[in-house]
């Protein structure tokens, strides 16, 4: 069982000394991954429903949320082992050729430690502000991931799809791994789980307790089998998010198929104290499992 840390580049951690200290400390304490979120803009008022908690995003619009790729590249320069992941990247808001280049660059600079955590988005008003249609964002995400994988693995790439068209382009540098960068999908709905089974390298479930996580994983396993894929083809991670858990819950998560738990600090102001608390309560017990 591995323990990851949510989230760098959010709120008080949007400061060079804190990004550096969090990254170095998390690596030293044995965390597996540091995760960085993404929102290009937030709004004071919106009609969209946040899929967790009360239905409202649990932070005001002026909460700092740094660009995750810049943040993780900075963290990469401060570390040598810990994995670096977007949690999550709103892929349909991006140009996939530009995003493929950004992801490959961060992966290359980190020595192959990057994971692209992907979400399709929930905040329609953010899409509208950026100028991207909210409708068909799932289909857009699928095509964008297909495009990025071509650009990461082929010397020259062509694509003629619904959203993207280009002929014989070269995108370098490539990621460290010849197969490209791992793509993990977030979400708990049936469409989200189908994305994992059909073309994901991993899953990031959120706001799930052990029994809930086990139920979702059982469904993923069914979908994988239907697609002719193996359970070992995907990595399964879960964040309890707002749900309080104890070290005793780690075994229940593991028995349900969870391989990594992503935890948020429970100290509001002292980020490093929160990291150290998570390490004592969860990283150390998880290492003994």
Predicted regions and their residues:
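Active-site-adjacent structural elements that line small-molecule/cofactor binding pockets in enzymes
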Residues: 1-289
């Amino acid at each position: 069982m591995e323990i990851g840390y949510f989230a760098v580049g959010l709120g008080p951690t949007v400061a060079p000394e804190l990004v550096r200290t969090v990254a170095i400390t998390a690596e030293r304490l044995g965390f597996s991954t540091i995760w960085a979120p993404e929102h290009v803009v937030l709004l004071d008022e919106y009609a969209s429903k946040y899929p967790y908690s009360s239905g409202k995003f649990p932070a005001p619009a002026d909460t700092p949320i740094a660009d995750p790729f810049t943040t993780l590249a900075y963290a990469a320069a401060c570390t040598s082992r810990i994995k670096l992941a977007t949690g999550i990247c709103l892929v349909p808001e991006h140009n996939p050729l530009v995003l493929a280049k950004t992801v490959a660059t961060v992966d290359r600079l980190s020595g192959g430690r990057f994971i692209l955590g992907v979400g399709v988005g929930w905040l329609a008003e953010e899409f509208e502000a950026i100028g991207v249609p909210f409708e068909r964002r799932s289909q857009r995400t699928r095509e964008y991931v297909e495009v990025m994988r071509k650009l990461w693995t082929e010397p020259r790439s062509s694509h003629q799809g619904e959203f993207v068209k280009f002929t014989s382009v070269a995108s370098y540098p490539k990621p460290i791994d010849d197969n490209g960068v791992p793509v993990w999908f977030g979400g708990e709905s049936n469409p989200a789980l189908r994305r994992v089974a059909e073309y994901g390298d991993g899953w990031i479930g959120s706001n799930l307790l052990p029994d809930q996580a086990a139920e979702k994983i059982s469904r993923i396993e069914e979908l994988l089998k239907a697609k002719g894929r193996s359970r070992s083809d995907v990595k399964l991670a879960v964040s309890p998010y707002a749900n309080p858990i104890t070290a005793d819950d780690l075994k229940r998560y593991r028995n349900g198929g969870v391989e990594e738990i992503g935890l948020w600090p429970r100290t509001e102001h002292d980020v490093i104290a929160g990291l150290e608390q998570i390490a004592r309560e969860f990283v150390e017990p998880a290492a003994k499992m």
